[in-house]
Amino acid sequence: MAVPKKKTSKSRRDMRRSHHALKGSAYGECPNCGELKRPHHVCGSCGHYDGREVVQNASA
């Protein structure tokens, strides 16, 4: 079984884990209705994506 030759210092351990943090979700404004929506997703409020209506009656 593989065993480390040297002890990993707290500094090196923490530097390795520096990329493990959760990142916040990115949101943008829908150009059609102005509601917040995820990038590259259909707007949940009006059903528009890329300048055209994709979903009929999204909120109604």
Swiss-Prot record:
MF GO annotations: structural constituent of ribosome
SUPFAM superfamilies: Zn-binding ribosomal proteins
The entry's keywords: Ribonucleoprotein, Ribosomal protein
Gene3D superfamilies: Single helix bin (1.20.5.640)
Compositional bias per record (Basic residues), positions renumbered to this chain: 1-22
Example of a GO cellular component annotation carried by this entry: large ribosomal subunit
GO biological process, one term: translation
Origin superkingdom: Bacteria
Matching Pfam families: Ribosomal_L32p (PF01783)
InterPro entries (alphabetical): Ribosomal_bL32, Ribosomal_bL32_bact, Ribosomal_zn-bd
UniProt xrefs under PANTHER family: 50S RIBOSOMAL PROTEIN L32, LARGE RIBOSOMAL SUBUNIT PROTEIN BL32
Family named by the database record: Belongs to the bacterial ribosomal protein bL32 family.
Protein name: Large ribosomal subunit protein bL32
